[in-house]
């Protein structure tokens, strides 16, 4: 195996024996084969000028399977590969494509599962198939950006929202990745990936807000009640809606975990009296927190950490999430999910063990912040707010991420943190006070709500009469972990945001030459020390 798609790649070079995430070499290689399968499928769709509902349903979900901490189940990944090959063959036949004119990724065949495992173990389908380090780096940058697009698109489609142009871009992009060896063409494609990342984030924002209302300032309880509970983690709001509706008279409470916390900010969910609070923190600490929760846990998406045996029988998965031995939520013929087993399981469990008390405040997405625009603008003009610091993105296991807690603590009192994603857990529970009633930590929501931060920045640019978003008193100190963060980064670069500090390390998949170009064009850098970074970002 060779995998360097996440921030925790071994030695910041790549995992070669087992993933730091927990996936073994078989699953890692099969995920490479799944991406190879998607490339072949996209290639035949492009050559046949073909797109239908089945393709649009399959590709985003299959991409989601390969994101870090989503699927660890070799049998599940094999099934996704088989679906892709069957769909590819159907399109070849339907469009009378000549296989002799197609690349191997669009023509390979298999007879047994063992054939798939053997093919997955070859260089041909791996990241290392591209020998040129810079071309490989650009292709992987685009691929990881598209993986995130696929994930966000899946969420939007789950709510009934879609955009065919995004699907057409994915097909075109993977076709170019197969064909192109031109660094300039691939760099431009990476920037175009940023464009479609923005469109996808906008689509998901529309899906979430039109379905559940605009997030509003909300206090979220961190304590527990004395009833059994169900803990829901991941990102999928539709799953939460179904779980809440099915459990409302069951005598159990529903708690969010990690990236599901922002669900409390949406008006729609406030009607459920048994939707009581958030339990725990970010995903790296789930093994201890899940054990203490005592009740069942529903994983709707990433991030799943390989579970301990002590609570493995309480973990349920749905959507693209997979791990050997975990129970899967049944899906009915009409597409809705049946959470009855989870609910009955919860009734037999003890209430959650308390982890902490108190409350946190969030809900500062674009609509809410722009409603406070006059107050914010006045605070900036009067000098009470000197700078906004975007501290968005992902959390992770590395001890180096303690940097973000210290950075938040040491920021001058006239600065305001704009955040979203699970990176927030490094500082959202700190008492950092407020500026004239404006909290010094404004949480916009999930990682995809980085779109809110962009909308806020663009609105402030217009309000201050500036020509360039980089003229705003906003600094960017972003932490990344998995591929959706790459999608967000490309979106920011496409929008022209410069001087982003990306940490705690730069991606292992960026070659020295590609890194140099990103530094020269966009001023990207990584973290140093807290004091030095506050000096350069805030002054």
Curated annotation (Swiss-Prot):
It is an enzyme of class 1 (oxidoreductase). Keywords: 4Fe-4S, Cytoplasm, Iron, Iron-sulfur, Metal-binding, Oxidoreductase. Binds 1 [4Fe-4S] cluster. Binds 1 hybrid [4Fe-2O-2S] cluster. One of its GO terms (cellular component) is cytoplasm. It is found in: Cytoplasm. InterPro entries: HCP/CODH, Hydroxylam_reduct, Prismane-like_a/b-sand, Prismane-like_sf, Prismane_a-bundle. The keyword Amino-acid biosynthesis does not apply. GO terms for molecular function: 4 iron, 4 sulfur cluster binding; hydroxylamine reductase activity; metal ion binding; peroxidase activity. Pfam families: Prismane. This is Hydroxylamine reductase. It comes from Methanocaldococcus jannaschii (strain ATCC 43067 / DSM 2661 / JAL-1 / JCM 10045 / NBRC 100440) (Methanococcus jannaschii). The gene is hcp.
């Amino acid at each position: 195996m060779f995998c360097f798609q996440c921030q925790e790649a071994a030695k910041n070079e790549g995992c070669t024996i087992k993933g730091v995430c927990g996936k073994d070499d078989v699953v890692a290689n099969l995920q490479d084969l799944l991406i190879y399968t998607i490339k072949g499928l996209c290639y035949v769709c492009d050559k046949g000028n073909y797109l239908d509902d089945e393709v649009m349903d399959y590709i985003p979900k299959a991409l989601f399977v390969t994101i870090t901490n989503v699927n660890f189940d070799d049998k599940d990944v094999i099934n996704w590969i088989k679906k892709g090959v069957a769909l590819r063959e159907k399109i070849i036949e339907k469009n009378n494509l000549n296989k002799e004119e197609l690349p191997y990724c669009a023509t390979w065949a298999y007879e047994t599962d063992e054939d798939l495992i053997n093919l997955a173990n070859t260089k041909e389908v791996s990241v290392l198939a591209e020998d040129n380090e810079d071309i490989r780096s650009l292709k992987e940058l685009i691929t990881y950006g598209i993986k995130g697009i696929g994930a966000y698109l899946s969420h939007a489609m789950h709510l009934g929202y879609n955009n065919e142009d995004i699907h057409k871009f994915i097909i075109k992009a993977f076709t170019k990745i197969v064909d192109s060896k031109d660094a300039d063409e691939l760099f431009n494609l990476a920037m175009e990936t940023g464009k479609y990342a923005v469109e996808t984030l906008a689509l998901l924002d529309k899906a979430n807000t039109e379905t559940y209302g605009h997030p509003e300032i909300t206090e979220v309880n961190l304590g527990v009640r004395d009833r059994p509970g169900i803990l829901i983690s991941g990102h999928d709001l539709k799953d939460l809606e179904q779980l809440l509706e099915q459990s409302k008279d069951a005598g159990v409470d529903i708690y969010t975990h990690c990236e599901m916390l922002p669900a409390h900010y949406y008006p729609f969910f406030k009607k459920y009296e048994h939707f009581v609070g958030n339990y725990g923190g970010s995903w790296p600490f789930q093994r201890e927190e899940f054990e203490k929760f005592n009740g069942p846990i529903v994983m709707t998406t990433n991030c799943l950490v390989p579970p301990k045996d002590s609570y493995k029988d309480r973990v349920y998965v749905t959507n693209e999430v997979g791990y050997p031995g975990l129970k899967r939520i049944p899906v009915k013929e009409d597409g809705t999910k049946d959470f009855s087993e989870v609910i009955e399981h919860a009734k037999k469990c003890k209430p959650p063990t308390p982890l902490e008390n108190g409350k946190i405040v969030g809900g500062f997405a674009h609509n809410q912040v722009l409603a406070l625009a006059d107050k914010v603008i006045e605070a900036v003009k009067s000098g009470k707010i000197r700078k906004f610091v975007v501290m968005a993105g992902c959390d992770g296991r590395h001890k180096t991420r303690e940097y973000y807690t210290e950075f938040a603590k040491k920021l001058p009192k006239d600065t305001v943190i704009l955040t979203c994603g699970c990176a927030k857990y490094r500082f959202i529970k700190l008492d950092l006070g407020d500026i004239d009633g404006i909290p010094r930590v404004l949480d916009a929501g999930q990682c995809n709500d980085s779109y809110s931060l962009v909308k806020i920045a663009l609105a402030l640019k217009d309000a201050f009469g500036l020509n360039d978003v980089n003229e705003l008193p906003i600094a960017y100190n972003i932490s990344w972990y998995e591929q959706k963060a790459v999608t967000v980064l490309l979106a920011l670069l496409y929008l022209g945001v410069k001087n982003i500090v990306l940490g705690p390390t730069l991606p292992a998949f960026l070659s020295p030459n590609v890194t140099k170009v990103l530094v020269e064009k966009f001023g990207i850098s990584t973290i140093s020390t807290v004091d030095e970074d506050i000096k350069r970002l805030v002054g």
